[in-house]
Amino acid sequence: MRIGHGYDAHKLVKGSHVVLGGIKIDSEFSIEAHSDGDIIIHSLIDSLLGAAAYGDLGTFFPSEDDKYKDISSRELLKEVVFKLKEDKYQISNVDVTYVGQLPKLNP
């Protein structure tokens, strides 16, 4: 059994929305990032990559590579899951916690 721990943080800037867990949420802020800036999926990806000893998100998907510009983090997650399956890894459980003041997620 392998265990990974993922983490992601981005700067908030004036904008129109954020993407969290693949869901677009209207907001007066946006997350500054090369991709869609989905910190929930980025953290999950980072954890999966770490558990498999593949490096981190920035190594696997470098921000200098224009093919990842504005890409949906869901697509990045699909690539990682495909690579894990290809290498015979099996994901048995994940747990993600969002810590942030904005956007407010409570009803």
State the predicted function of each range.
Residues R2-H5, P103-N106:
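C-terminal binding/interaction regions
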Residues I3, H10-K14, V80-D87:
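Extended beta-strand/beta-hairpin segments
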Residues A9-K24:
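Acidic-glycine-rich active-site phosphate/pyrophosphate-binding loop
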Residues I25-S35, S63-Y68:
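A short glycine/serine-rich beta->alpha loop
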Residues S35-I40, S72:
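A generic structural signal for residues located within well-ordered alpha-helices
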Residues I40, L44, L48:
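Active-site His/Glu-centered metal-binding helix of metallohydrolases
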Residues L48-I91, Q101-P103:
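Glycine- and Gly-Pro-enriched alpha-helical subdomains that act as flexible
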Residues V94:
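Conserved, well-structured core segments that form or line functional sites
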